[in-house]
Amino acid sequence: MALAACGGGGVSDPPLSGAQALAFAYFQKCVNPIFVTPLQVAVGGTTTTKTCAAAACHASATGAGGAFRIIATAQPVDLSSAANTPAVIRTSDLYKNFTSALGETVIASPSQSLLLNKPLVRNVFHGGGVVFASTSDSNVRLIEYWIANPVPQGQDEFSTAIYSTMFSPAFNPSSPNSSTCNSF
C-alpha cells in the first residue's frame, strides 16, 4: 500500500523477509472450531455457556471483544481443490478468522500470545471471563501447538511441509477428516 508523503512522494511498507507463518490447514481443522463451539465460561462467579463468536463477545459485526473478531458462519475451505488458490482462500471468511487470530499471537511463543492469555485470564483482563480453566485444557493444547509450530522459514501459511508433523496420520486435503490434530 502506498501512502502519500510530504513533498508528493510515496511511502510504502518494506517487503517481509524471513518472517514465519502459522499453518492455515491446522487453524482450519483444529483451532477455528474452538471459537464456534459452546464452551463453559466463568464470569464473576457465574458459569454460562457461550461461544467466542457470540454477539456479545467476538462476533465479527457486533462483538464487544476488541480487535479479535470471528465470523461464526465461516465455512471450511476445500484445500484439495485446485480452484482454491492462495488468492482465493485469502478472500474467504475462514481466512478472515485466521488473520484475526494471528493478530492475537506471537509466533512460536504461546505464553506471550493474547489468544491464550486472555481466555486463561493469565496476567491480562478478559471481559469474557475465564474460558479455559487451565493450560491442560485440550483446547489450550491445540492453540498452543498451532502457535508453537510455525511453518518452515520462507514458506507461507499454505505450506504442506507441516502436514506430517501437525496431524496424525499426515494431513490429506482430499480427506481432511482422516487425520487428527496433534497437540502438546
Give the predicted meaning of each segment.
Residues C6-F184:
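Aromatic- and Gly/Pro-enriched helix-to-coil junctions and flexible linker segments
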Residues M1-A4:
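Bacterial N-terminal signal peptides
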